[in-house]
Amino acid sequence: MHHNLNTKYYFISNFDTINIDQQDKSTIIIYRNYSSQKINQLAILKFKSYCRKRGLKFYLSNNVKLAIKLRLDGAYIPSFNKNFNHLNYKHDKNFEIIGSAHNLKEIRIKELQKVNKIFLSSLFKKNKN
């Protein structure tokens, strides 16, 4: 049940290779860019190649269909994504879907979404200073 707990997840919003080079092989790179509506598929493919050369897995956030199309290592479904459309898509057996949750209700939703791994994200209070 608790296998591979030494996996780290590193979230990026732009393709900056300097921070990626500092990650070890057990790190999974997750690209999430919520500030831009347009997805640059060519840049994602270049970064996929860059991560593969360094032995890192590369996941795309919140777009399972595109991650399958681009043959990435997996996809990340954030806690606010509650849809089940990805269950209709065919993917390789090595393709992994992970999700995050903040509470028990979101954990149950991720279980219904049939994600391979769920990691718990804590909720932080806003700093009032």
Feature-to-residue mapping (PLM):
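Active-site/ligand-binding-proximal alpha/beta "capping" segment
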Residues: E111-N129
